[in-house]
């Protein structure tokens, strides 16, 4: 049934769909592109401290950034046959007000594009997402890095204050030592 929606003719290459498996040569090309794109991001963004690769066989990159609210944020990228997955650790499991904290991040998921909060190992809070390889380009990779970084920077202390009794006091102490 046609419902009147039309997509741009070039929104995806004619031979490529989200469900396509990329062969070894295509993955090698994408791997090289990601290396190049992350290298350029490293030189153009002062807060990116390091871009590293996994020592193992998997296609995995680490982007470490200095923050203002959270001292460091590291984003892990993992290349699969269909998608590039990404995640960053936000905070450990809450010691108190877990229900309120989980509600806060679930409600925040509604406002995020290309990422979502999730619960990981030991109930820690992560920010995760994935993008189809057919849609991956340098602009999208930069958007992903910016989205994860800015979301962590914006919500790190508010989430800690919900989940930890001493967080507000620590934040005040931290801010007072920065102004001295």
For each predicted feature, which ranges?
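Ampiphathic alpha-helical segments that act as solvent-exposed interaction surfaces
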Residues: 100-112, 133-164
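A short beta-strand motif that forms the metal-chelation/ATP-contact edge
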Residues: 62-63, 126-129
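The feature represents the first ordered module of a protein
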Residues: 65-99
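Charge-rich, low-complexity N-terminal segments
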Residues: 1-72, 120
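A generic structural motif
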Residues: 90-94, 131-137
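Generic alpha-helical secondary structure signal
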Residues: 25-28, 32, 96-100, 139
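Short, highly charged C-terminal tails/helix-capping segments
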Residues: 160-180
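Short, internal acidic amphipathic alpha-helical interface segments
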Residues: 85-126
């Amino acid at each position: 049934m046609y419902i009147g929606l039309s997509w741009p003719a070039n929104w995806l290459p004619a031979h490529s769909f989200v469900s396509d498996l990329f062969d070894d040569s295509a993955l090698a090309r994408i791997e090289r592109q990601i290396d190049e794109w992350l290298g350029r991001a490293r030189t153009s963004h002062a807060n990116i401290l390091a871009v590293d690769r996994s020592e193992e066989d998997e296609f995995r990159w680490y982007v470490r950034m200095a923050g203002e609210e959270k001292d460091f944020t590291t984003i892990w990228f993992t290349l699969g046959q269909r998608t590039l997955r990404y995640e960053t650790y936000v905070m450990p499991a809450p010691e108190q007000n877990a229900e309120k904290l989980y509600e806060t991040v679930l409600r925040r998921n509604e406002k995020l594009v290309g990422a979502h909060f999730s619960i990981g190992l030991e109930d820690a809070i992560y920010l995760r997402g994935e993008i189809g390889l057919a849609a991956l380009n340098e602009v999208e990779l930069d958007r992903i890095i910016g989205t994860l970084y800015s979301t962590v920077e914006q919500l790190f202390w508010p989430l800690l204050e919900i989940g930890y009794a001493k967080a507000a006091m620590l934040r005040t102490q931290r801010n007072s030592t920065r102004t001295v």
